[in-house]
């Protein structure tokens, strides 16, 4: 059964401790959360208590590649304690996608971490923005990256893929066996800015058909820069709930 979550980066401007933010999420219909950087500085016991009292599951965690390389043991210990077995590299700078050589270097780094994580019971995924969809070879840099790392999952950000000029539904169909989490975000492709879900250029109906056909497990709401994060939380939860 499909489950819904929010990427906590969307709520980073709420000036409350993370457990209090989780309590706000618990007031919605969302089933879980996708952690961002704040969890690394929070009281883990308090976070676990908040997850439990709000019946929220850890959908995944965004963790930088440098953080995984520099403190692998610390990162895996934290997320293991949180019961989070899916780690997602949320961003690599555009220079990583400029050429076949730079993509190969990024793939080598991601592949090494993915192998270590698999041995320790974790899955590694990569979350796109727009820079990954530059032309490369017979496809895009994103295609080349995924072709180079067999154990790398693809957390597709539907809105950023569309803003980059890619076809998010075709991507979901092509990589269905690697997409367990999909980011439902929206953007204005002309200005390359995030907007409320349903107000940008994303064809929500087509994307919903694609993720359903691919049996995507988690629908994750994200808005990079909402004017009102609490209202955005409610809007995201209600919209994803309507997709069940």
Predicted regions and their residues:
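Histidine-acidic metal/acid-base catalytic patches
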Residues: 1-5, 10-26, 78-84, 119-123, ...
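N-terminal pre-domain/capping segments
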Residues: 1-80
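Short, contiguous strand/loop micro-motifs
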Residues: 8-9, 33-35, 61-63, 100-101, ...
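Active-site-proximal loop/turn and secondary-structure-junction residues that shape catalytic pockets
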Residues: 10-12, 39, 64-67, 93-95, ...
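Short amphipathic alpha-helical segments at helix-loop
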Residues: 32, 94-98, 192, 221
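Catalytic-core regions built around general acid/base machinery
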Residues: 46-53, 105-116, 206-210
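Active-site acidic/histidine proton-transfer and metal-coordination neighborhood
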Residues: 65-154, 230
């Amino acid at each position: 059964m499909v489950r819904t979550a929010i990427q906590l980066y969307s709520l980073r401007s709420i000036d409350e401790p993370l457990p209090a933010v989780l309590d706000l999420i618990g007031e919605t219909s969302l089933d879980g959360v996708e952690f961002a950087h704040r969890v690394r500085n929070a009281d883990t016991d308090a976070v676990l208590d908040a997850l439990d009292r709000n019946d929220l599951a850890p959908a995944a965690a965004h963790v930088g590649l440098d953080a995984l390389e520099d403190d692998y043991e610390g990162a895996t210990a934290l997320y293991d304690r949180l019961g989070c077995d899916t780690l997602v590299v949320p961003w690599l700078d555009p220079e990583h996608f400029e050429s076949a050589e730079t993509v190969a270097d990024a793939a080598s780094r991601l592949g090494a971490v993915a192998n270590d994580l698999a041995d320790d019971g974790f899955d590694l995924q990569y979350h796109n923005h727009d820079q990954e969809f530059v032309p490369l070879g017979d496809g895009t840099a994103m295609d080349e990256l995924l072709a180079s790392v067999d154990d790398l999952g693809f957390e597709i950000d539907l809105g950023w893929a569309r803003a980059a000029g890619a076809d998010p539904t075709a991507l979901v169909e092509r990589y269905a066996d690697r997409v367990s989490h999909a980011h439902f975000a929206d953007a204005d492709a002309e200005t390359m800015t995030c907007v409320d879900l349903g107000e940008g250029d994303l064809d929500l109906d087509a994307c919903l058909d694609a993720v359903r056909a691919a049996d995507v497990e988690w629908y994750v709401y994200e808005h990079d820069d909402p004017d009102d994060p609490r209202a955005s939380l409610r809007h995201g939860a209600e919209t994803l709930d309507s997709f069940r």
